[in-house]
Amino acid sequence: MITISDKLINGTVAAQLTASLMAVSCITVTFCVNLTMVQDKANGTRKDFNVAPVSKEKIYLGYFLSTVANSLMVNGLAFVLCLGYLLKMGWYMNAADVLWVLFDMILLVLFGSTLSSIISFPLTTQGQLSAVGTIVSAGYGFLCGAYMPISNFGPGLQKALSYLPSTYATSLIKNHMLHGVFREMERKNYPDEMVEAIRDTLDCNPVF
């Protein structure tokens, strides 16, 4: 009979929840921040930039870098709060795990900034801004497997979602957040089949 401590169970659930939160937050916050570019077009602020002796490339680079900086600040604070939650529920991460998650966060913010810049570039009105913000905020978590593991979807949908980069980004951050949990399970000599099944269920082995 296998006995699993409440701390390990709570730590596993907390790590999965915080990983999903960070995976979604790094993209949705970035989208919301980058919508400033659309806001400037809609309210006419962009006209002031256009008459300034600054190239369009530098203007767009400024939007991109400001999006990255603001998103990193917001998501950095979210990450600190997530670490506090993990500390309360069940802490199994080491320093290397924390650094890897920080790297994942930066990678996701850069991906989100690039994606949001491409999508926001042709938008010019408040209505378009609201529509994109709503769609991304509501739908991204499902598409990347954060709200519900992709392993729970049907084979066809799993195959379709496997072509999206966000799927693997979410899996990456889950692997690093849950690495300490799986290490503890192996230390306690839990069956390999059980640990592997948990990995598969939580999309830590993204093979679709």
Regions found by a protein language model. Give the residues of each.
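Residue-level recognition of transmembrane alpha-helices
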Residues: 21, 40, 49, 63-64, ...
